[in-house]
């Protein structure tokens, strides 16, 4: 709730400056980043300091009987910087593995690494949602799809029987978040009713930054933050398109004296709206004919659904 309020305030200030000062840029980027980093830091520290946020692990208990060693597993709730990672055995990764060189302080180092990744995920996802909110219904529909996937993972991870059967990390009490996830999905679908093309209402940065923040924090709470690049692939590609375009433009301007583009326009969804070979100098001109806004949105939704399915599949591939 605290994260939601902070993101709403951040987005509101951005929208307020755009309307009040007639400034399309709104709040300066550095102030947005400061706000996003602050929220990420608070979430990371809360995960570290709260004694109620734990995960359940199976610990080996070997016993020797009649020259045979029998290994039993006892489930114990532990406070560890553990997360879910695809393509590996048991799907679990302890951040302390990267800080073993710190010796007795490896666990503390693991938590520091976890907090750093939390900050990055919160900033990246909230910014990605903000960039995706450029066409009617695009960010809303995409976020609803992501919300459904997170709700399912949350439900499975909060049930000890289902989590054991599906080999998903069991997090005591996380099942309670399903109610919040359902509210989030319901709000998005209700908003989409009026936000679909042609839109009657718009969320602005107040909504898009908050939606991205909710998705990021939710994924972190259920230890699925490393699945974000797959699940939130639409947000990722929108972010990358802007970064690539800006970096390439600055590089070519410095080298050749004039800035050059890779895409006709960024974020990426705007690239498909523009006519190819029609005066816009860019390396990637396809598609030549502009695609209607409604078709771009639906195609991005379809990609989002496939990404959600792939996210679940990765948990079974080891």
Please place each PLM-identified region on the residue numbering.
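Alpha-helical transmembrane segments within multi-pass membrane transporters and channels
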Residues: 7-17
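Individual transmembrane alpha-helices with interfacial aromatic-anchor signatures
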Residues: 29-33
């Amino acid at each position: 709730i605290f994260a939601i309020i902070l993101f709403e305030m951040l987005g509101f200030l951005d929208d307020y400056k755009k309307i009040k000062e007639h400034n399309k840029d709104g709040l300066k980027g550095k102030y947005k980043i400061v706000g996003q980093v602050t929220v990420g830091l608070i979430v990371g520290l809360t995960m570290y300091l709260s004694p109620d946020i734990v995960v359940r692990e199976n610990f080996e208990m070997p016993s020797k009987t009649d020259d045979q060693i029998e290994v039993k597993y006892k489930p114990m709730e532990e406070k560890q910087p553990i997360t879910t990672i695809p393509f590996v055995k048991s799907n679990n990764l302890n951040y302390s593995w990267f800080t073993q060189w710190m010796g007795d302080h490896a666990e503390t180092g693991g938590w520091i690494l976890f907090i750093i990744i939390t900050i990055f995920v919160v900033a990246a996802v909230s910014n990605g949602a903000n960039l995706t909110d450029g066409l009617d219904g695009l960010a809303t529909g995409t976020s609803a799809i992501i919300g459904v996937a997170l709700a399912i993972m949350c439900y499975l991870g909060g049930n000890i029987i289902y989590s054991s059967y599906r080999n998903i990390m069991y997090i005591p009490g996380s099942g309670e978040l399903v109610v919040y996830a359902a509210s989030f999905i319901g709000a998005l679908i209700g908003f989409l009713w009026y936000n679909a093309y042609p839109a009657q209402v718009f969320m602005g940065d107040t909504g898009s930054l908050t939606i991205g923040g909710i998705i990021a924090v939710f994924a972190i709470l259920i230890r699925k933050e490393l699945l974000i690049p797959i699940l939130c692939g639409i947000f990722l590609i929108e972010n990358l398109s802007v970064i690539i375009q800006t970096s390439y433009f600055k590089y070519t301007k410095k080298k050749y004296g004039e800035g050059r583009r890779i895409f006709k326009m960024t974020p990426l969804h705007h690239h498909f709206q523009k006519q190819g070979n029609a005066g816009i100098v860019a390396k990637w001109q396809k598609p030549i004919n502009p695609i209607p806004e409604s078709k771009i949105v639906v195609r991005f939704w379809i990609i989002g659904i496939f990404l959600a399915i792939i996210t679940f599949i990765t948990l079974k591939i080891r």
